[in-house]
Amino acid sequence: MHVNGKVALVTGAAQGIGRAFAEALLLKGAKVALVDWNLEAGVQCKAALDEQFEPQKTLFIQCDVADQQQLRDTFRKVVDHFGRLDILVNNAGVNNEKNWEKTLQINLVSVISGTYLGLDYMSKQNGGEGGIIINMSSLAGLMPVAQQPVYCASKHGIVGFTRSAALAANLMNSGVRLNAICPGFVNTAILESIEKEENMGQYIEYKDHIKDMIKYYGILDPPLIANGLITLIEDDALNGAIMKITTSKGIHFQDYDTTPFQAKTQ
């Protein structure tokens, strides 16, 4: 898919990886709906992007992605404003082991809800023109993390859901591709959450273990993750792909064996 002229919706777009995604999409000629719960950060992000790009290229919508009605209203507003939707990036996420229900609602449930809303608008069988959905996971979605079991579970869920939904979308000839990104530690505000008891709960005493992991794996910068996003969008052959981004190997992909049933039906 060529990005130029397309309309993208990015959740968690006001800061960090989400903002890097928005900038990369705008540089490629897309129009971008900036969706974030943080009103102040969202307004500041929109203003900063307006200085670099034409103001009509972006739209900021405050939304709590864990609120189903707000999320539905947000999709409707984006399509009403821009007239279409081509690219969806479910990026909003938190790290909170203490309030673990919140973590699952934001990290996993909102991704599933957003994906189905995206399919409602983009699927060819619903009158859409096709498109692409990118769901943000993590290396924690591919490996165990003792100090963050709920965060880890939410990210594993994204990987399994995205791979399965990609197969379903292809089976239905929806014209929509689905892929996920699994980066290592990224230089965002989430890294600061490991210092706080209200985030880590019973695992706060192990924060030094996480710091040791960060030193071992290194820290990625958001623009590299945005490069991965553009790759997934522009390569029409990628569907159900799980992109890994690490300091040691850069952008690469997780290998999976074909299931016996898939092998039989191919």
Swiss-Prot record:
Tissue: Detected in colon epithelium (at protein level).
Induction statement: Down-regulated by cortisol, dexamethasone and betamethasone. Down-regulated in colon cancer. Up-regulated by TGFB1.
UniProt name for this protein: 15-hydroxyprostaglandin dehydrogenase [NAD(+)]
Entry keyword annotation includes Cytoplasm: yes
UniProt xrefs under Gene3D superfamilies: NAD(P)-binding Rossmann-like Domain
GO CC, any one term: extracellular exosome
PROSITE patterns cross-referenced by the UniProt entry: ADH_SHORT
Keywords in alphabetical order: Cytoplasm, Disease variant, Fatty acid metabolism, Lipid metabolism, NAD, Oxidoreductase, Prostaglandin metabolism, Tumor suppressor
Predominant subcellular localization, coarse grouping: cytoplasm
Catalytic reactions of this protein: prostaglandin E2 + NAD(+) = 15-oxoprostaglandin E2 + NADH + H(+); (15S)-hydroxy-(5Z,8Z,11Z,13E)-eicosatetraenoate + NAD(+) = 15-oxo-(5Z,8Z,11Z,13E)-eicosatetraenoate + NADH + H(+); (11R)-hydroxy-(5Z,8Z,12E,14Z)-eicosatetraenoate + NAD(+) = 11-oxo-(5Z,8Z,12E,14Z)-eicosatetraenoate + NADH + H(+); lipoxin A4 + NAD(+) = 15-oxo-(5S,6R)-dihydroxy-(7E,9E,11Z,13E)-eicosatetraenoate + NADH + H(+)
Broad enzyme group: oxidoreductase
Function: Catalyzes the NAD-dependent dehydrogenation (oxidation) of a broad array of hydroxylated polyunsaturated fatty acids (mainly eicosanoids and docosanoids, including prostaglandins, lipoxins and resolvins), yielding their corresponding keto (oxo) metabolites. Decreases the levels of the pro-proliferative prostaglandins such as prostaglandin E2 (whose activity is increased in cancer because of an increase in the expression of cyclooxygenase 2) and generates oxo-fatty acid products that can profoundly influence cell function by abrogating pro-inflammatory cytokine expression.
PANTHER family, A to Z: 15-HYDROXYPROSTAGLANDIN DEHYDROGENASE [NAD(+)]
Binding site for NAD(+): 12-20, 36-37, 63-65, 91, 151-155, 186-188
Species name: Homo sapiens
Coiled-coil region list: none
